[in-house]
């Protein structure tokens, strides 16, 4: 945070908005991810979300972030990670009977702990390697998780039939 703010010469308001952007984007993009989950099934929608985040971090790492606006754009793409929660819940809960869905969703929700761990670890990594290299380092666990996800995650055998956009708008 501090290194980014210094390098980009951000005001306090810009720092606050930069930090809030992924959270706000994630909240808004959950609707879009929910549509993808219902139309493509949870596994495919979750994979698309993960690939979007990985590509965004790779581009930020290789090309760098040189302005406040670029930081906000990256924040929008990182918001997709938060939106992916809309894929995790049905992916987990549809496998279990109602009496076990709370536990399944609680375990799936623990996946959000990666954001907290990143917030704890990233500042130390930024000091040691430079803040733009943190984007590259973040790719290591993200790609590993994507590989495991693709190998191990399965859509439940009984998923609701996909709906058209017109059917959603009729609600």
For the regions a language model picked out, list residue spans one by one.
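Extracellular/periplasmic helix-loop-helix junction of adjacent transmembrane segments
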Residues: 1-27, 68-69
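Interfacial helix-cap and linker-helix signal at transmembrane-aqueous boundaries
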Residues: 4-5, 36-37, 124-129
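Residue-level signature of mid-helix packing/kink "hotspots" within the transmembrane helices
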Residues: 23-31, 83, 115-117
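Conserved MFS/SLC helix-loop-helix module at the cytosolic interface between two early adjacent transmembrane helices
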Residues: 28-68
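A generic transmembrane-helix signature of 12-TM secondary carrier transporters
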Residues: 50, 54-58, 74-75, 139-146
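Cytoplasmic helix-loop-helix junction between adjacent transmembrane helices
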Residues: 74-111
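Helix-loop-helix hairpin linking two adjacent transmembrane segments in secondary transporters
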Residues: 107-157
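Flexible cytoplasmic inter-helical loops of multi-pass small-molecule transporters
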Residues: 151-171
């Amino acid at each position: 945070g501090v290194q980014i703010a210094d390098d980009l010469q951000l005001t306090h308001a810009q720092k606050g908005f930069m930090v809030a952007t992924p959270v706000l984007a994630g909240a808004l993009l959950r609707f879009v991810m929910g549509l993808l989950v219902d139309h493509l099934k949870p596994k495919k929608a979750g994979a698309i979300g993960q690939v979007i985040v990985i590509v965004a971090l790779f581009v930020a790492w290789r090309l760098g972030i040189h302005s406040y606006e670029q930081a906000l754009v990256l924040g929008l793409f990182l918001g997709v990670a938060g939106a992916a929660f809309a894929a995790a819940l049905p992916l987990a809960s549809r496998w279990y009977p109602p009496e076990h869905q709370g536990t399944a969703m609680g375990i799936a929700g623990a996946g959000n702990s990666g954001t907290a761990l990143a917030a704890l670890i990233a500042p130390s990594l930024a000091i040691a390697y430079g803040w733009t290299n943190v984007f590259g380092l973040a790719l290591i666990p993200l790609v590993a998780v994507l590989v495991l996800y693709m190998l191990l995650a399965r859509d439940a055998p009984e998923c609701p039939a996909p709906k058209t956009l017109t059917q959603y708008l009729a609600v």
